[in-house]
Amino acid sequence: MEPRQLFSDPTADPISTAGAASNALSCASFNLPEGGILQLPNGEIITLSAPAAFKPPSCNLALRSVPNIIASGGVVGGTASGTMGLKADDDSHFSDWRDPFYASTFPQCYALAATTIIAYTLVIMLFITPRSFLDGGVVVLGRKGFTNGGGGTSIGGRPWLQKVAALSVAISLTIANAATFRAAEQQYSWGVQNAKQLQEDVLGGAELKIIRIISDTFLWLAQAQTLIRLFPRQREKVIIKWTAFALITLDVIFQSLNSFKYGGSDLTRPKFTEAVPALSYLFALALGVLYAAWVLYYSIMKKRYAFYHPLMKNMILVAVLSVVSILVPVVFFILDISKPDFAGWGDYVRWVGAAAASVIVWEWVERIEALEREEKKDGILGREVFDGDEMLEASQSEHAWPKMKRKGSGGSDSQDTESGGGGKDGGPSLSRFGAWSKISTLTSKHRTEPSSRNEPNEGSSPVAETTNDDERPRFLSPPLWPARPTPAATPVSRTDTTSAASTMYAVRYHTMTELTSYGTPPPTRNMGRLSGSESRGSSRHRDYGSASPGSAPAQDARSTQNSHVGAKASSAGSRWHALTPTVSSRDFVTRSEPRSSKMQRDENSRWDLRARVEEFAATQAENLREKFRPTLDTNNLPVTVIPAPPRRGAAIAQLCEEEELNHSSREGTVREESRNSNASGTVIAVGGAQTPIQTSFSPPPRAANSSMSTAQMPRPQLSPIVTQGSFTNNRYNHLPVTVIPAPPRQDPARAPSQPQSPSLVALGKQPARSDSSTTPSP
């Protein structure tokens, strides 16, 4: 069409203008400006909302060269042959001729090509390229953690949700590329460029609608899985999981309704004239914003490793890519409000941005955790445990701790779960007693297992430790709760009782042969067992400490002798001695612990005949050993009686009484009577206020061969009255003193015969003490 000037130009030549008008009179075309009003014969009035052109039907366009009007408002040179295929129903292709450049077809095609390349790059990262990790401060390639062994933590694995999501995005963008090329070629054949129509043709396809819904579902699930990894607490993981499932379900429902039921609505600009498209857009926006907020919160909490670290110089690049990928939904939400035309090609960027937000953030988190492990691997702290996590993770399949190891790893590996009291699948006690049985099982495991493993080390023979094939060194975790200490059998304090002579002590008596052969026997340990078989096997062993006083020495001596005999049998290296009657109950408990602990796994099985037969055989064998075990007679052993020391406060009372007597006596009488007492061999003390009182002590009977006089005898330990009373006062230091030996500490009539072992005696009841009578002097 040829443009025509509607208003006269004052600078134009009137002669040339008239000639041009006469030449174009037969085929006149008019350019109608925006805002013009057209009035039709039927009275209808049309207001032009955009520039238009009027062309008379008699104009022969095939013989003239006219410019073509493109959708962007510009004019390019060309022939009219490019518009010969237009029809009357193609007016919708020229709905907007003045779209800005950022909303035209060129940025849309470039954006689609760039996002497709990024999508395939993510797929290559997930499926082909090996992962990088930190190894001793150097970033290397590989698929393992810090070590390549079985104990290393693998950080190279990727969840399958990310792989499916990235692959679906790449497939979707490939289909969008094919549809865009087809629609652009059709517009090129028409000689026009309409970005809005191009976008509607591409996104309106049924195949792309279906693949987009599937891709979005896996994208949101992958992001939810990434969020679950960010937070270690089990409670937070559960909250994130169910919140994500609810939002993803609602988003899929409303997106499906918006794509198929409300397909006639505007797909390129969010003009929310109906509720379903608005809700679909709202749920998609909520998922993106929540994901971005939680990832930013995690990066702030881990700011020490998240943005820069000397061991990983490229951490800042990964951090920038992660932040950009998670902020894409927020940025385009702002652009949708301020510039709605951006939605034409912004959908592709948001599409691949959601995939990158999951893949790159996962890599970011793995690098942060690798730096944390590298820094804390030499620390002394253990795993971080939160309150309530053990109860939330409790299940019947995960009841036992530690978990059951492989069968081929040895007999010792299977014992980690045998002492917990559970069954083969972790213990059926969870269904019987609830979740609290997990705590009690863990407590019983740690209380019983170390005592059974360390028990052979307490024997007198070091060879006995190697007789058990199941005893192998293992590294166990510390107990969750400290074990309750065994009750200590402490004797009653004799000074706090009303009668100091009423306390009796029972001690073991050993012959000289036993002392020289084995030395001091180890104390008997009181071991408690939770299972029925072990409690029956060790019931007699525990009864030794709770027996009556009369039978306690015999039972203790019996257990001590049997323990020595068992140690001798173990040191010989022959396992046949384990079945002889001379084996002790402690060795039996130690050797039968692996077997009894294996039976604990099947204690709730009614049809486990093998376990029942083994338990019955163990019980009968213990009964036979109890019958054939020899006993020692400890009732006829010699007894030596040792008197109890004086009670607290008696010496002080006597001292005060002696001081009162000394101060009330007269000095002259004491001097005269003390001279007279030198020949009689008595110690005179003055008592009373007026008359002197003489106290004499009879000397004890002595042996016939003793010719030592009283003054020449070695000075024994003085009584508290003499030492702290009269002889420590400065007033009586010049008085002569005659020391009289103390009386014997036991009744000569009750003196026993010479014991077999003078070094070890038995304590008994204190007899009545006979002191010399005190008679006043005449």
From Swiss-Prot:
Protein name per Swiss-Prot or TrEMBL: pH-response regulator protein palH/prr-4
Annotated membrane topology: Multi-pass membrane protein
InterPro entries per UniProt: PalH
Record function comment: Required for the proteolytic cleavage of the transcription factor pacc-1 in response to alkaline ambient pH.
Transmembrane regions listed in the UniProt entry: 109-129, 161-181, 202-222, 238-258, 276-296, 315-335, 342-362
Cell compartments where the protein resides: Cell membrane
GO BP terms: cellular response to pH
Biased composition (Polar residues): 457-466, 720-732, 769-778
ATP-binding found in the keyword field: no
Record topological domains on the Extracellular side: 1-108, 182-201, 259-275, 336-341
Biased composition (Basic and acidic residues): 446-456, 588-605, 661-675
A Gene Ontology cellular-component term: plasma membrane
Origin species: Neurospora crassa (strain ATCC 24698 / 74-OR23-1A / CBS 708.71 / DSM 1257 / FGSC 987)
Alphabetical keyword list: Cell membrane, Membrane, Transmembrane, Transmembrane helix
Biased composition (Low complexity): 749-759
Periplasmic-facing ranges: 130-160, 223-237, 297-314, 363-778
Lineage: Eukaryota, Fungi, Dikarya, Ascomycota, Pezizomycotina
Region of interest: Disordered: 394-499, 514-605, 660-778
Family to which this protein belongs: Belongs to the palH/RIM21 family.
